[in-house]
Amino acid sequence: MNKAKITKENIVKLLTQSDSLEFEETQNEGSFNFTDFFTNNREKIQNMTTASCLSFLKNRQSIMRVIKSADFTFGSVTIKKTRNNSERVGVNDMTFRRLDAMVRVHLVGMIKDNGSALTEAINSLPSHPLIASYGLATTDLKSCVLGVLLGGSLPLISSVLNFEIAALVLAIYQDAKHVELGIDMSKFSTKEAVGKVCTVLKSKGYNMNSVEIGKAKQYADILKACSPKAKGLAAMDHYKEGLTSIYSMFNATIDFGKNDSI
């Protein structure tokens, strides 16, 4: 039996006629591949410097609110405001999540290739709210890579060559330490995130060999040294000297313990 393409007309035949109809299993014209998307759209953000990428990540939440409030255009690209999460997004459409992942991959490329860019990242990343709340020390290339990926779409990023194991280890860390990290599992399933990353890796034929496991251990050692803090506690740390002084006015002391909830 000849296999048919998945078209509107053939779907109608499948639903309304008694003739047997088998579709081509390999047809996947509508699937999304972030690696291809990044390659095809990278020139749209090629003028972003290390500083501008770092600023984007540091102010991500505020930038996202502005971009998602209405149709947002930069250059020839328009990020359309979607009315709800079920609204269809095409494989070539720019979304904030895809743009965010592109900026992160672009930044990692710069800090890997340029020593001054790496130094700039080492100096800037500790001031980023999410990195501060994780207690992640960004002192070298690998720790900076983790810092740049933190908060991004790990399933998208894991599809890019040489990002696989870093994205997977970070996803597993967030799942294993979701309580300490203060992640609300009703809003974000860390286990599901690990599954999505693994699905991407399996679909691209990623081989988790001994070399990759060795890289995983290096990333895991960096993350094991983190001292996660609740957001409120991270902010309190910023005012540590002043808070200590004010508490003393009431003959009291303050505990800046790493895992306290505020």
Swiss-Prot record:
It is found in: Virion. It comes from the Viruses. Keywords: Capsid protein, Helical capsid protein, Ribonucleoprotein, RNA-binding, Viral nucleoprotein, Virion. InterPro entries: Tospo_nucleocap. One of its GO terms (molecular function) is RNA binding. Changing residue 158 to A: In strain: NL-07. GO terms for cellular component: helical viral capsid; ribonucleoprotein complex; viral nucleocapsid. Encapsidates the RNA. Belongs to the tospovirus nucleocapsid protein family. This is Nucleoprotein.
